[in-house]
A protein has these predicted regions:
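Acidic, metal-coordinating catalytic segment for phosphate/diphosphate chemistry
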Residues: 1-43
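Conserved Nudix-box catalytic region and its N-terminal flanking loop in Nudix hydrolases
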Residues: 46-88
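Short glycine/serine/proline-enriched coil/turn segments at secondary-structure junctions
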Residues: 35, 61, 106-108
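Conserved beta-strand segments that form the floor/walls of ligand-binding pockets within enzyme
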Residues: 25, 52-53, 66, 98, ...
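Nucleotide phosphate-binding site architecture
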Residues: 5, 27, 52, 73, ...
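Unchanged
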Residues: 72-129
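Beta-strand-connecting loop/turn residues
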Residues: 22, 48-50, 109, 122
């Protein structure tokens, strides 16, 4: 980060008063910019005892198998995001979502939330990713 999103002036990395971590702080308006982890949501969609996997069509990890997942959007719940990602990536409609696993990857500042769910009617297709 180079510039303040509040006023446009430059920012510096420093520990603000009352804090114990480095943050980007504006040199003009003193706004503190918090950089937080990103939330990744996804599904483990099952139909008749089988789990739907996706083969990646884009980098990173093109041609690797993965579960349908992606970044959570503003204004949605984690189950809504997981269902949306399953539709976007595999054209699968899901229901009965139950939280299955939460894990974090601190090295890339991401938190993953996966839901077990039913793949409605077993149908799926190819998404753009």
């Amino acid at each position: 980060m180079k510039f303040c999103t509040s006023c446009g002036n430059s920012v510096i990395l420093q520990i603000p008063a009352g804090d114990d971590r480095e943050r980007f702080v504006c040199t003009s308006c003193e706004h503190i910019h918090y950089i937080n982890p990103r939330i990744i949501v996804g599904c483990v969609p099952a139909y008749e005892g089988r789990v739907l996997l996706c083969k990646r069509a884009i980098e990173p990890r093109r041609n690797y198998w993965t579960l349908p997942a992606g970044f959570m959007e503003n204004g949605e719940t984690t189950p809504e995001g997981a269902a949306r990602e399953t539709w976007e990536e595999a054209r699968g409609r899901v229901s009965n979502l139950e939280l299955y696993r939460v894990f974090d990857v601190p090295s890339i500042s991401q938190v993953y939330m996966f839901y077990r769910c039913d793949l409605d009617d077993g149908s799926f297709g190819v998404g753009p990713e």
